[in-house]
Amino acid sequence: MSQTPLLSIVAAVYNGEKFLAQFFECIEQQQLDSYELILVNDGSTDNSLVVIAEWQERLQNVQVLEQENQGVSVARNTGLAAASGKYLAFPDIDDKLYPGMYRTLLEMAEKEHLDIATCNGTYVYEKRRESHPIFPLDRLPSTGVLPGHVWLKQALDSRKFLHVTWLNIYRHDFIRQHHFHFEPGLRHQDIPWTTEALLAAERVQYTSQQFYDYYIHSESVSHKPDNDDTLMRSARHYMKILEMLEAINQRYPDKVRHIAACRWQTPKKAWESSIPSIA
């Protein structure tokens, strides 16, 4: 491996013992020549560290950072501060990455000098519902290189866009240049991050290939049963997201002017993501 890895893969780990074996297998199957895997243990109380230690003997380039439990955003920021790769990725350990995902995105990014390379994925449900693409193929086909705000407009206009980091890789210098970080303690922190990253990016390309299974299950932080306390916390998160999105809109007025959905669909998505149904 070269001194500077081509890709830094940053993932938060909190009580992920049952998911880690599949996650490591997914990373191994990427067959990358130049990468580092940075795992941030966010105060796990299960055997996550035991599983990680076993896989460290099998995989090279695995770095483990420790912190008290502070949530996904802080864990990602900790990993981001330690990352040295030319590109960055932020997968979730309880999802599935298909072989070729990062190789494909890296080839796109290197060939076209991209700030962000992005792909499609699949919703996989724990019960009943059939799996289906995150971005319907008829609404969001593969693109050439686009300015980030143009891609954001197309994606929002599809009415099916999902604000997530884990379908993307980011050029590290681009992230440094704009001093991007994840908002500590914020549920659905990917909404403001993704919105601003796309508004700031000059070169973005999307492939409709489905490389990532997003599992919607009861143990996901985003899909836990809700009570009155969690509904109130969700409302506070929603208000914070709206404040952040409005500030982002004001930082990029010339670009937002051409994206009507930035004024309504992004806040709508924040509401849908942060406030579960109480019916």
What is each PLM-predicted segment?
Residues 72, 93-205, 212-231:
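Donor-binding/catalytic cores of nucleotide-activated saccharide
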Residues 88:
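Short aromatic/hydrophobic "clamp" motif used to bind/position activated sugar donors
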Residues 18-21, 46-55, 96, 100:
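Acidic helix N-cap motif at the loop->helix transition within catalytic regions
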Residues 15-29:
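Short, well-formed alpha-helical segments that are part of the catalytic scaffolds
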Residues 26, 41-50, 68:
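A conserved acidic beta->alpha catalytic loop
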Residues 5-8, 36, 192:
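Cell-envelope/extracellular polymer assembly enzymes that use nucleotide-activated donors
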Residues 215-279:
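C-terminal subregions of glycosyltransferases and related glycan-biosynthesis enzymes
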Residues 67-83, 93:
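Glycine-rich, basic loop-to-helix element that forms the pyrophosphate-binding segment
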